[in-house]
């Protein structure tokens, strides 16, 4: 049986009753506390932003990438951010299901990348499952984004401006 962190990344249902759930919540709270600290950092102090983002992600944020605080995140370890990205202020990432952001990606203000959903069964609503979000190179996003893959598109207000469809 997979541990609870692997289950999240594999899209399996995770229940608060499972062994390891407390450790998951502990990690989430620790990440959110670091994000709170990040919210107090000046946007001009990218060195400190990068230090705190490294702590959140569990790996170094590329030097060529800019993140403007405040930045909200529940769990950063399964999140990867490429080179030359620009992430505007007030973005929210729910990263438990995994987020992959390619190179040269622009993410507008208040964008939400949400990888976690709840069970549709009302009797099991507290259980969650993750679905990965993959954003390929040179994408610009200005929406709330649920699990999917986006490539070479400009997303704004739930529409893809490149192909004029709700979904590519």
Describe the residue ranges of each PLM region:
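Terminal amphipathic alpha-helical/low-complexity segments used for targeting or macromolecular assembly
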Residues: 1-64
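Short secondary-structure boundary/capping segments
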Residues: 5-6, 57, 125, 131-132, ...
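Residue-level preference for alpha-helix termini and adjacent loops
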Residues: 13, 23, 60, 70-72, ...
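Short, electropositive, low-hydrophobicity segments enriched in small/polar residues
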Residues: 15, 99, 163-166
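Flexible, glycine/small-residue-enriched loop-and-beta-strand segment within the central core
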Residues: 71-82, 86-152
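Low-complexity basic/metal-binding stretches
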Residues: 144-168
